[in-house]
Amino acid sequence: GGVDSSVAALLMKEKGYTCMGATMKLYQNEDVGLRREHTCCSLDDVEDARSVAYALDMPYYVFNFADRFKTDVIDKFVHAYETGVTPNPCIDCNRYLKFDKLFQRMVELNYDYVVTGHYAQIDFDENTGRYLLKKAVDHNKDQSYVLWSLTQEQLKHVQFPLGGMEKCEVRALAEAHNFINARKHDSQDICFVQNGSYADFIEQYTGKTYPPGDFVDTDGNVLGQHRGVIRYTIGQRKGLGVALPAP
């Protein structure tokens, strides 16, 4: 339902490809405590995507991958914070959903490519016979780092039409074609976490409370108090209320 995926579809249609639009249904807003509209799985976003698909004369489908998203993204996200690790759920979503489950659907439906609105580029090295994942031209929007897990087989069947464009060019194309989402804001936060408050999300999602406790060094000295283990990660220095020379 975003402007980037919409323009990616437009560019592929203009190249003469037969395209279909797809939205991955990953969760119900109420299941993850979201109340706002225009999340990636809201009805509004589905309707935006459907509108663009209609304008481009493409069939459009919604695939329900909620069970896999819960297991491979949300549950892993929660477990990471519970163990003091900083997760990146966007990497897991790409790895297990977009380029696994959606990739499987591409094969089943006899299409040749999964096309997304990611800002990244794919090149083929004739000398090594390998596909290369490269940064986008727009370095401010580059997303190649969240695509590191793509295999050679996946890279062979993936296209990123926006990799050679600036974001302003993408919006201009969307406006020129009167796309309903041409001025839609870019998503900044984790899609299933409201207002960026991951700790509140984890407590709501798990039904657990993570009580405050002591910061203790390796010698058993109490250095201060923390506000609950999920609010901190290994190596963190800022926001601890403790002045130390090293993490």
PLM regions and their residue ranges:
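ATP-dependent adenylation/nucleotidyltransferase module used to activate substrates
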Residues: 1-148, 159, 169, 175
